[in-house]
């Protein structure tokens, strides 16, 4: 990807604009170019509390939601706990350990898995498909700094509320195969 960030002031508040051009593909083919534009305004920035609000614009013909509101909030409590909220991505409670070389986090985050599939039925070997699924990962994360490296361990539950296979040139809503959780 290629990224650009610009810092400015809007309504007397620090505002950060960023853009990204992302090239996507697989080990077999280049597949698509997509982009992301964001604008985030810092509403509060103190030693204990940081809060921002903004918009993210997804420039991708297969995007499920082209415009996404963004809200971040971080607060450091007196007991060492940190509330770390990045909506719509994640919600965590964090705590530094061992003289700030370790950190434990409890919470949840949304993630996406995507990959390309080729020659599914053999009738059209040039037809390309994209599989995309939404994952919600809930659990505990431990991170530990050793020199210049950070070792991470995760445990918890992964929920996949939706997954779809669609032709590369089609929209995410035009799925040829769909998975949903079975309650």
Description of each model-found segment:
Residues 3, 16-22, 52-56, 72, ...:
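Transmembrane beta-strands of outer-membrane beta-barrel proteins
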Residues 7-9, 22-30, 44, 56-62, ...:
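Sequence/structural signature of outer-membrane beta-barrel proteins
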Residues 7, 25-29, 41, 59-61, ...:
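Outer-membrane beta-barrel proteins
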Residues 11-17, 47-51, 79-81, 100-104, ...:
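Outer-envelope beta-barrel architecture signal
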Residues 2-8, 37-45, 55-57, 71-75, ...:
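Residues on the lipid-exposed face of transmembrane beta-strands in outer-membrane beta-barrel proteins
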């Amino acid at each position: 990807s290629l990224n650009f960030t610009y810092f400015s002031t809007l309504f007397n508040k620090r505002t950060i604009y960023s853009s990204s051009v992302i090239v996507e593909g697989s080990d077999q083919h280049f597949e698509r170019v997509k982009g992301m534009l964001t604008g985030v305004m810092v509403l509060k920035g103190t030693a204990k509390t940081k809060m921002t609000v903004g918009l993210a614009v997804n420039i991708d013909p297969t995007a499920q939601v082209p415009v996404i509101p963004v809200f971040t909030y971080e607060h450091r409590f007196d007991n060492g706990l940190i509330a770390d909220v990045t909506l719509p991505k994640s919600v965590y409670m964090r705590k530094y350990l061992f003289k700030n070389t370790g950190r434990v986090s409890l919470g949840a985050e949304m993630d996406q898995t995507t990959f390309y599939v080729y020659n599914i039925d053999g009738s059209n070997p040039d037809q390309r498909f994209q599989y995309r699924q939404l994952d919600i990962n809930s659990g505990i994360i431990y991170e530990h700094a050793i020199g210049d490296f950070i070792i991470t361990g995760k445990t918890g539950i992964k929920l996949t509320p939706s997954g779809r296979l669609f032709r590369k040139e089609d929209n995410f809503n035009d799925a040829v195969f769909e998975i949903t959780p079975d309650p």
